[in-house]
Amino acid sequence: MAEELQLVSFTLGSEEFGVDIGMVQEIVRMPDITKVPRAPEFVEGVVNLRGKIIPVVDLRRRFLLPVTAATKSTRIIVATLGGRTVGMIVDTVSEVLRLDAASVEATPEMVASQIDSSFLKGIAKLEGRLLILLDLGLVLDTDQVKALPAIA
């Protein structure tokens, strides 16, 4: 039997991304974010999520994409990275998908040149669209994840 992947899909601008659902704890609406002095540029700040303070990363900034204002559709994907809870701002969360692992192909060089290719697991072909698969464990390298709780 072919291996099946379960992914949460989301958008940043015109691109659609997917992340392993196993790393996602929850998806929340955009709360008020408290800025943190001297945090890395891609760290938007921290939020209080049911009594727990978690750092929030703006994935647009992390991927060096143009930054836009939050909308009613903006969400924070709360994930566990390196044993730490981190929120990641995305434009919209689309759906939960199941797909055959065999449908994932290597990331084309043109796509990899726009986003650090070390963040990418590959590209999945879906009905008429492409989904860029991210490796959340690499979106924030180990040292950056270790530093995040110190920010919060």
Give the residues covered by each predicted segment.
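An acidic, low-aromatic, low-complexity terminal/linker signal
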Residues: M1-A152
